Amino acid sequence: MDIQNIKETIAMIEEQNFDIRTITMGISLLDCIDADIDKAAEKIYQKIVKKAGKLVEVGNEIGHELGIKIVNKRVSVTPIAIIGAATAADDYTPLALAMDRAAKEIGIDFIGGYSALVQKGYQKGDEILIKSMPKALAATERVCASVNVGSTKTGINMTAVRDMGETIKIMSKGDKWLNAKLVVFANAVEDNPFMAGAFHGVGEADTIINVGVSGPGVVKRALEKVRGESFDILAETIKKTAFKITRIGQLVGQMASERLNVEFGIVDLSLAPTPAIGDSVARVLEEMGLETVGTHGTTAALAMLNDAVKKGGVMAAERVGGLSGAFIPVSEDEGMIAAVNSGALNIEKLEAMTCVCSVGLDMIAIPEETPASTIAAMIADEAAIGVINQKTTAVRIIPMGKEGEQIEFGGLFGVAPVMRVNKASSADFIARGGQIPAPIHSFKN
């Protein structure tokens, strides 16, 4: 084995903020369906505790053995709208409370799956879940929610987009954490290990382990060694680095699945930043030669980074999936925060960047007076990018405070500068409702 490779791997862990961001256990709740919501809630609690009871213990064991920090151990479950639909209840908060109770019992920080899939229309459970979302998220600490409002195959459910704009607006009047725990998707994936958008798809095995890695600091350090070189060498360097990062994720996932006696799912080939210095995707882009993220060339740099990470990672993992790409959450990336505060990065540029990377407008604070119709229109724009380009896009925005203020979240969530939003109205556009049809290139059968 190449001694230099061993040295580089040790440096990744000790000096460059490399970590496993999450081991997420996906759990099917289809066998917890019951006409009585209280019985369903108890079944949900019992199954999560039974299946994931040792998740934290095993995660800590593996981290200690390998000398790698495994930051989060999490759980995702079947979309609760499906489970709740079998009951006569008009509020699914009891199911959210059962999820929250189970999460606390097993010691995980978040549990995802208070979700609805409404890309082509509402069923009974979907409407009830969305209406109960503000209450359910306010009543729980660790439950995360998501709604899929569009897909390349079905188009965009604009009625759902309108409803989600209103839901986000309602939740903005409560705690700042409510909207930090809600993601609105187009082309949502069934095996996402990252919160807040994780849910366990109905096409998945009963219980699986998915792994998400994190390594922007590792990539930046590698690029520092090839300053001034051509893009060919830049891309090759990123690919080799991504291979090493993903290989460790694969090893951790295999070990976790064996010890928990659960099927191994996927490694998500994502670069996920944190607010820590040296763990920023924005700083990787700047290392490529940009004075600051947000300037002209940012989208091209991000496109190349995203593609090279996938090319390197796909060879290192048995199965890849999830969101797989570079994440650009504003509040969770110190380089992004600095770019927004300097005026170099705005929402319009972030929207352009989401065309070529993972997810979308993520952890962005906007002025609290922003109307629900404008929030819905932002969701519609992101959904359109995803639907037309056959990729996952999402919105996680926090209407709070006034433009220029800083919203403190702390921990992995960081600080969100309140960004300027276009004040021209989209109200008549959003009020139409209905469905934007699927694009012509989706018609492939």
UniProtKB/Swiss-Prot annotation:
Segments passing through the bilayer: none
Top-level taxonomic group: Bacteria
InterPro entries documented for this protein: UPF0210
Pfam families reported for this sequence: DUF711
Subunit structure comment from the entry: Homodimer.
HAMAP family: UPF0210 (MF_01221)
Family note: Belongs to the UPF0210 family.
Name listed for the protein in its UniProt record: UPF0210 protein YjhD
Source organism of the structure: Lactococcus lactis subsp. lactis (strain IL1403)
